[in-house]
Design a protein with these regions (language model features):
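N-terminal small-domain helix-loop-helix segment of the aminotransferase-like
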Residues: 1-93, 100
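Short glycine-rich anion-binding loops that position phosphate/pyrophosphate groups of nucleotides
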Residues: 41-44, 94-95, 119, 163-167, ...
């Protein structure tokens, strides 16, 4: 029998997504109304009314491809985060951003650093490009940034840091994150995955997007799937300097955001 695909792809264990409520109801013979879905950290309040109105207005144009460059969304994000629009890359959810980063910056055999007990997609994205994962043991189920910095090797091209961490919920303060960024070599890209940033208490929040001005190797990744209740739309974005966004946009699929 023929064997298709490279070995590193065949070795990937597919991501186990949370089951839809309808599937759980069929599998266990339950009433959908009695099921509460917690598996994927979706917003329990659902889609905001303002978003429903905007989607209804846009429905008439569903026969056409969306704006491939996302002009209006980038303009709004540019104003919100006080960065130029060409510093923004749009993704099909922030999951897309994580994978784009791996494809843009990691060649087969090169290494990627991330923490034990962090988001499963970091390992999948690394395997998908034939990269070598350096998994740094967690401390109290969170990132050990000192150990992660020390684990960077000559062939390391990418580091993933989830803050707050998914799935353990641990959090790293601004001073510790910035101290870590100062230790990372300039040729190693750091993805700061902030999918759950909006859930932080106000006293713990900080505007990491402004660090991008200081660190040319930093990507700040955000999503509309969690706090904004738009998981089904698949919209995420990254903020980085133009030298980084240029490469990410070469890899990004056209029309990747609805």
């Amino acid at each position: 029998m023929s064997t298709f695909g490279p070995e590193y792809v065949r070795a990937i264990a597919p991501y186990q997504a949370g089951k839809p409520i309808a599937e759980v109801a069929r599998e266990f013979g339950l009433d959908e109304a009695n099921i509460v879905k917690l598996a994927s950290n979706e917003n329990p309040f659902g889609v905001p009314e303002s978003s429903k109105a905007a989607m209804a207005q846009a429905a008439a144009d569903l026969g056409r491809y969306p704006d491939a460059n996302g002009f209006e969304l980038k303009a709004a994000l540019s104003a919100r985060y006080d960065v130029p629009a060409d510093w923004i890359t749009l993704g099909n959810g922030s999951n897309d951003i994580l994978e784009i980063a791996a494809h843009a910056f990691v060649q087969k055999g090169e290494s990627v650093v991330f923490a034990q007990y962090s988001f499963a997609v970091y390992a999948l994205a690394t395997q998908g490009v034939g990269g070598r994962a350096i998994v740094v043991p967690a401390v109290n189920y969170g990132h050990d940034l000192e150990a992660m910095a020390a684990s960077i090797e000559a062939d390391t091209r990418l580091v993933y840091v989830a803050n707050p961490n998914n799935p353990t919920g641990t959090f790293i303060g601004a001073a510790e994150i910035e101290a870590f960024l100062q230790q990372v070599p300039a040729n190693v890209v750091v993805v700061l995955d902030e999918a759950y940033n909006e859930y932080l208490a106000p006293e713990h929040q900080f505007e990491s997007s402004q660090w991008v001005r200081k660190y040319p190797n930093l990507i700040v990744s955000r999503t509309f799937s969690k706090a904004y209740g738009l998981a089904g739309l698949r919209v995420g974005f990254a903020i980085a300097q133009p030298a980084v966004t240029d490469l990410m946009n070469r890899i990004r699929q056209p029309f990747n955001v609805n």
